Amino acid sequence: ILAVCLFLMPLIHEPLDRTVSLRASIRPRVFVPRDGRRLFVAVAVVYLATWMVGCFFQSFSAPIAYTCFGAASPFAGSIILALAMAPSVLGGPAVQKFHPKKALAVSFAVVVASTAALALFVATGAELAFMAACAVFSFSMGACLATALRMLLLEVNVLQVSAILASINLVAYA
């Protein structure tokens, strides 16, 4: 599929005129909108919080399955990782019709609550409850990230999109 996409890329019409050279377009541009600095900080907090827990799952799903729940099969760790990541794709579309500020506040509160529940269920060895909390966390993480990004993108024009995305990803990966 990736090879087909690679060969089809040159055939896709780019709606924007080329304004910079290829060399300049490869260099990341950091941009924070003057009027959206507080929003940028809020989005950065959302990204960092959700990505950190997501990275935790990517690194420690198998050890959690073995150490906390006694599952020796790699399948258990895979299920934990899948439940912690896959439902996130449903979060954004589920909240797109709601007011962005309210959707972000509610979804982030659910992220915090589900993260606390994950810690509780690991400590108590409640495997099924942990799996359910993984799915709730993932869904709310997707809602948070999609809503936060939508709010940030509404603050910039189309020529600033790549710069704002580079900036928020720089914060997330730093």
Write out the residue ranges for each language-model feature.
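C-terminal membrane-cytosol helix-exit motif in multi-pass small-molecule transporters
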Residues: 2-20
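Pair of pore-lining "gating" transmembrane helices in MFS-fold secondary transporters
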Residues: 36-57, 131, 135-139
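Hydrophobic/aromatic end-of-helix segments at the C-terminal termini of transmembrane alpha-helices
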Residues: 57-65, 148
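Helix-to-coil boundary motifs at intracellular loop junctions of multi-pass secondary transporters
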Residues: 64-69, 97, 151-156
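Loop-to-transmembrane helix entry
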Residues: 67-86, 163, 167
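Transmembrane alpha-helices of Major Facilitator/SLC transporters
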Residues: 76-100, 111-114
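C-terminal transmembrane helical hairpin of 12-TM major facilitator-type secondary transporters
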Residues: 102-146
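A late C-terminal transmembrane helix in Major Facilitator Superfamily
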Residues: 138-143, 149-174
